[in-house]
From Swiss-Prot:
Keywords, in A-Z order: ATP-binding, Cell membrane, Copper, Copper transport, Ion transport, Magnesium, Membrane, Metal-binding, Nucleotide-binding, Phosphoprotein, Translocase, Transmembrane, Transmembrane helix, Transport
Protein name: Probable copper-importing P-type ATPase A
Main function: Probably involved in copper import under copper limiting conditions.
Topology of this chain in the membrane: Multi-pass membrane protein
pH dependence, entry free text: Optimum pH is 6.25.
Length: 727
């Protein structure tokens, strides 16, 4: 019995650090029926692949460990957006409230340190006054940390909340002890506990604000989705909500208006700005029968379209979904941070205890020892580790989408930086994929025979012959016993005679001589044209030559890759001479050209290079490229290709420009560099900060501030990718 596998995304609330996301991920993966689950701290989302369970059970499992979960679908998106705004407003209010109460305590402390002992300063140094100001900060504003710490300890997965709760509580408790039960010390630390909470809350608020900017690419794409459409019904034009548009509706789109949804032009011509989908700045000319896509802009002509796709099935919706999935995925390099985050908080708790005991034993000043210990607790930051990789991936995939490069996940984004070999399919990748008949050699009737045979073919060369036949007025004849021979040609019976159309290799297998056409065929192939022969069971009757224009940017793109040290190969089912001619024109070495390759053999060449230690990227656009795309380290599909190719590939180039391959590698390298910088900063910050705190070089307030802003530095570094021009 077939298993019904589902994939759902949930928005997770209540996470504060990498330990939270790791705990939720572990809990989801332990649920019966769950095949895999990943939780992303930066996007605050969980992606769950499951069979025998329900979304309600999954949500309940998250709630049971102290977090919130909401199914991320169309029905809940508005609610999720509203709850996020409410949460941010509440956090902003708490931050302002906390700052108002903390500021007098801080100013009084600074004034006292500067030698001021006036009545106002003395008033704010009264134990009861400080307690009244610090109490709401500690237990109202800081309640979020206590709540988080409770759930973390309950599930035996201590997180940042535990560190903050213990650290600030220790400072607060010491202040109460000194203020109301004085022995030998009257020092109060209410300003320290309050300031730590205020600074950490400020850091969290800025972190949430910065994190929202990492998703700007998604927001920009979502803004392309129109709210209304002009529809023709019963001969009258009316405005309706986009949700009311149905397949086969006729929509009217005026110059300057956005296309509401995908459809085919049935009246009018225009040029459409597709830059938001493809990154291509030049408007694309469109005429009747051409497809247009939702979110694109009609620049000059009035057009009518017949709707073909709506809602989540439109190209724009699928692109948004692909980018969201990519931003929620994990790169292999993140495993380092995940492993460290899992043991980070217990280690910090242990170091804080060691600091307390050793400092107290050496100095005999247990209050000083406690302050050193508090500094260790509040400076340690697992958040920076948790955000280092996902924030860079979010921004990197967003930059890619803006440039027409759709990267499906963190693994592909990281893997592209390591590519040192690229295999290019010829037809539709190096060439335009729109072959045309250039030469017909043989008696006139071969056009009709070719035309009849190729009518049933799906091959691009076959379609070129059919288009030529229609253009010259060829007549189709009834055909029986039609057979497609992958990589070789086609055959069928017409008027009782069995014919074959295809390659010379197939003719040789049939023991047919083509000496009569040998010289002309050689000349055509050396010019880079593909020659197809027509034969019956006795002799070769003639041949047709087909040429496909090389893409304008092909030579430049290949040169760019070679300058990067990437070996470029070409694979094609075409004959050796035609393949070498094309390869020479675009600058591919002759020994890097694989010709006369059957569709099922393309994957073999990928495997061969991989066995030689190469990191291989495969670029293709057809159904027969799918196995090779799947096997490659990074499969790259051209946006003009088949759905199967794009579904199999790790990356889709929406504009079909070969120069986008180089952009993809540059973007991948830049993103990986940011990830490494982020991880380095997070490691160094904790490696240096914790010893400094333990030895008393940082007081708790400075330690808390450093902790708060360490995450911000990681986010800002990731966001700097937005300013990078990828070439």
């Amino acid at each position: 019995m077939a298993t019904n596998t589902k994939m759902e995304t949930f928005v997770i609330t209540g996470m504060t650090c990498a330990n939270c996301s790791a705990r939720i991920e572990k809990e989801l993966n332990e649920q019966p029926g769950v095949m895999s689950a990943t939780v992303n701290l930066a996007t605050e989302k969980a992606s769950v692949k499951y069979t025998d369970t329900t979304t309600e059970r999954l949500i309940k499992s998250v709630e049971n460990i102290g977090y919130g979960a909401i199914l991320y679908d169309e029905a809940h998106k508005q609610k999720i957006a509203e709850e996020k705004q409410t949460y941010l407003r509440k956090m902003k209010f708490d931050l302002i409230f906390s700052a108002i109460l903390t500021l007098p305590l801080m100013l009084a402390m600074i004034a006292m340190m500067l030698g001021s002992h006036g009545p106002i300063v003395s008033f704010f140094h009264l134990s009861l006054v400080q307690l009244l100001f610090a109490l709401p900060v500690q237990f109202y504003v800081g309640w979020r940390f206590y709540k988080g710490a409770y759930h973390a300890l309950k599930t035996k997965a201590p997180n940042m909340d535990v560190l903050v709760a213990i650290g600030t509580s220790a400072a607060f408790a010491l202040s109460i002890y000194n203020g109301f039960f004085p022995s030998h010390s009257h020092d109060l630390y209410f300003e320290s506990s309050s300031m730590i909470i205020t600074l950490i809350l400020l850091g969290k608020y800025l972190e949430h604000t910065a994190k929202s900017k990492t998703g700007d690419a998604i927001k920009q794409m979502m803004s392309l989705q129109t709210k209304t459409a002009q529809v023709l019904r019963d001969g009258k034009e009316e405005t309706i909500a986009i949700d009311e548009v149905m397949i086969d509706d006729i929509l009217v789109i005026r110059p300057g208006e956005q296309v509401p949804t995908d459809g085919r032009i049935i009246a009018g011509t225009s040029a459409l700005d597709e830059s938001m989908l493809t990154g291509e700045s030049v408007p694309v000319e469109k005429k009747e029968k051409d497809m247009v896509f939702g979110g694109t802009i009609n620049t000059n002509g009035l057009i009518q379209i017949q709707v073909s796709q709506i809602g989540k099935d439109t190209v724009l919706a699928q692109i948004i979904q692909m980018v969201e999935d990519a931003q929620g995925s994990k790169a292999p390099i993140q495993q380092i941070a995940d492993k460290i985050s899992g043991i980070f908080v217990p280690i910090v708790l242990f170091l804080a205890l060691v600091t307390l005991l050793v400092t107290g034993w050496l100095t005999k000043d247990w209050q000083l020892a406690l302050l050193h210990s508090v500094s260790v607790l509040v400076i340690a930051c697992p958040c920076a580790l948790g955000l280092a990789t996902p924030t860079a991936i979010m921004v990197g995939t967003g930059v890619g989408a803006h440039n027409g490069i759709l990267i499906k996940g963190g693994e592909a984004l990281e893997g592209a930086a390591h590519l040192n070999s690229i295999i290019l399919d010829k037809t539709g990748t190096i060439t335009q994929g729109r072959p045309e008949v250039t030469d017909v050699i043989g008696p006139k009737e071969i056009i009709s025979l070719f035309y009849s045979l190729e009518h049933a073919s799906e091959h691009p060369l076959g379609k070129a012959i059919v288009a030529y036949g229609a253009k010259v007025g060829a007549k189709t004849q009834p055909i029986t016993d039609f057979v497609a021979h992958p990589g070789a040609g086609i055959s069928g019976t017409i008027n009782g005679v069995h014919y074959f159309a295809g390659t010379r290799k197939r003719l040789a297998e049939m023991n047919l001589s083509f000496d009569e056409f040998q010289e002309q065929a050689l000349e055509l192939e050396q010019a880079g044209k593909t020659v197809m022969f027509l034969a019956n069971e006795e002799q070769v009757l003639g041949m047709i030559a087909v040429a496909d224009q090389i893409k304008e940017d092909a030579k430049q793109a290949i040169e760019q890759l070679q300058q990067k040290g990437v070996d470029v190969f070409m694979v094609t089912g075409d004959n050796q001479r035609a393949a070498q001619a094309i390869g020479k024109q675009v600058g591919i070495d002759s020994d890097h050209i694989f010709a006369e390759v059957l569709p099922e053999e393309k994957a073999n060449y990928v495997e061969k290079l991989q066995k030689a230690g190469k990191k291989v990227g495969m670029v293709g656009d057809g159904i027969n490229d799918a196995p090779a795309l799947a096997l490659a380290d990074v499969g790259i599909a051209m946006g003009s290709g088949t759905d199967i190719a794009m579904e199999t590939a790790d990356v889709t180039l929406m504009n079909s420009h070969l120069t986008s391959i180089n952009q993809m590698i540059s973007l991948s390298a830049a993103t990986l560099k940011k990830i490494k910088q982020n991880l380095f900063w997070a490691f160094i910050y904790n490696t240096i900060g914790i010893p400094f705190a333990a030895f008393g070089f940082l007081n708790p307030i400075i330690a808390g501030g450093a902790m708060a802003f360490s995450s911000i530095s990681v986010l800002l570094n990731s966001l700097s990718l937005n300013r990078k021009t990828i070439k």
